[in-house]
Structures are given as C-alpha cells and as structure tokens.
Amino acid sequence: NKNKVFIADTKYNRARYDAVGYRIDYSNFIEYEKKLERKKNWLINNLQVLQEHLEEMFHIDYSILSFEVEAVFFINTPTFYMFNGKYKALTLLRIKEYIENTWDYPIIKLEDKTNKRILKYSHPYFKNPIIISTE
C-alpha cells in the first residue's frame, strides 16, 4: 500500500430519509467537491510546505514528498453521495479504520447465472464501469 496524506473536509448533515433529501444532499456535495478539489490540488503542489511544518512541529524524520494525497469527506450521518461521489465520504465510525487501511468501500459482486459470470462494482458504484469476470 502506498503511504498517503489525507486532506479532508467535514460536513454535518441532517439525517435524510426520502428521495428529495437524497437529491438535496447529493447536489450540495457536488458543490463541496469543488472546495475539496482546490484543497487537494494545493496540498499536492505544497507537500514541501507540509513536510517542513511536520519537521518543525513534530520532529518527523522521514519524507512525505512521495506520499499520495487523498481527499475525503468526513460526515456525521450516511448520505446517498457516499455511493456515487467523486470523493469517498466516511462516517465518523469508519474514519479510523479507513485511515489505518483496515476498511474500504466494498466491491459489490453480483452473479449473472444466465451468462455464467460475475459482475463487480466498485466505488463510485454508479459511475465506474462494471468489471466482468468468470471467477
């Protein structure tokens, strides 16, 4: 696994249980993506600044300059955006596991018995192409 620096935006959302609420949340997150994208791009272009800060503040003795920068949302309640967003949205219960690389969005496997194949869907579930295999 590649070492990562996470850049996150936190969102406190009301719990929504209807289609209109899901649409509103999704539309809001599409707007939030723009801000998170700017943060991610800034960090990618300024890893040296973060490196110097970490050396000064925490006396780290390793380089983060080759680390991957991953943008994520931290959220208080599940939302439809989690399944199809450009960035992963992690509920409070999953943040630690995700950062420690002990949990990730699962690959959903569906068996197509007619054609004797397995269809695999990965995050974002409705945007990514289906992976077809004969496992």
Whereabouts are the PLM-identified features?
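Intrinsically disordered, low-complexity Ser/Thr/Pro/Gly-rich regulatory segments
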Residues: K2-E135
